[in-house]
């Protein structure tokens, strides 16, 4: 088997672009992604302007978003038919009241081409409540399947492996690409793996170790965000 074409896909919770922006930009530029799937993109006043500025600082273009998730692309790279959807967070009973655990979330994805093969990239950010996350994941997976393509799903899952979200992803037949990648949170002393990269059957991929990427330093990783990124390489093999 010989190596075929590849795509570099960066999944990164950028903490609302509120930490050391220069450090964050150095990390992203060193990773040199074709696509950056962002969680906690800047929002509220001047949302689009901020996201375009953030993308420009990374050397990328802002092309699609839903809630606080965004997709950025490198020059010469396209995202076809982006799909955005709200992820509604259920009400839970707190004593005598029903309250929402968080504001509605979102997921965003799109079709891309790898070596003439269509696939989908999807990014999400699940909530803090364990029951809510399961309900949210149902909605995310429904969106993933609506592409009718093999897909890569990445995001901040707010849960460690062994929890119901991870179990559900495994039951769907998805491959956990980060199983050997190590913890992703907190960036200055990572002890929890709460960020995921899951691949559907029909695709091949791996997470590139951060310490193997020239220009990525521990200091910049700790300063740029509270999460560590995951750089995924998707490949097709030819005989």
Q: Over which residues does each language-model region extend?
A:
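His/acidic metal-ligating clusters that form di-metal
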Residues: 109-113, 118-120, 134-157, 165-166
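N-terminal, active-site-proximal structural segment of metallo-dependent hydrolase catalytic domains
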Residues: 1-57, 70, 138, 236-239
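Alpha-helical elements of Rossmann-like donor-binding domains used by nucleotide-donor carbohydrate transfer enzymes
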Residues: 23-27, 53, 135-142, 164, ...
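Active-site environment of divalent metal-dependent phosphoester hydrolases
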Residues: 17-20, 42-47, 129-132, 157-164, ...
């Amino acid at each position: 088997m010989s190596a075929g074409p590849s795509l570099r896909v960066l999944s990164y919770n950028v903490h609302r672009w509120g930490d050391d922006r220069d450090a964050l930009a150095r990390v992203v530029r060193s990773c040199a992604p074709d696509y950056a799937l962002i969680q906690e993109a800047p929002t509220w006043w001047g949302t689009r302007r901020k996201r375009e500025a953030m993308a420009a600082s990374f050397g990328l273009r802002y092309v699609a978003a839903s809630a606080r998730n965004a997709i950025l692309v490198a020059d010469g790279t396209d995202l076809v038919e982006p799909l955005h959807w709200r992820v509604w967070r259920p009400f839970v009973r707190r004593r005598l009241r029903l309250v929402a655990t968080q504001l509605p979330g979102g997921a965003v994805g799109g079709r891309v081409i790898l070596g003439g093969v269509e696939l989908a990239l999807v990014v999400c950010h699940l909530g803090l409540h364990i029951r809510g996350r399961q309900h949210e994941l149902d909605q995310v997976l429904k969106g993933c399947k609506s592409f009718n393509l093999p897909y890569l799903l990445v995001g901040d899952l707010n849960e460690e492996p062994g929890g119901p979200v991870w179990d559900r992803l495994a039951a769907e037949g998805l491959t956990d690409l980060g199983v050997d990648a190590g913890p992703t949170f907190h960036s200055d002393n990572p002890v929890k793996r709460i960020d995921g990269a899951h691949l559907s059957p029909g695709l091949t991929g791996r997470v590139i170790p951060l310490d193997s990427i020239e220009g990525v330093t521990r200091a910049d990783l700790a300063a740029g965000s509270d999460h560590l990124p995951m750089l995924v390489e998707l490949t097709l093999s030819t005989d």
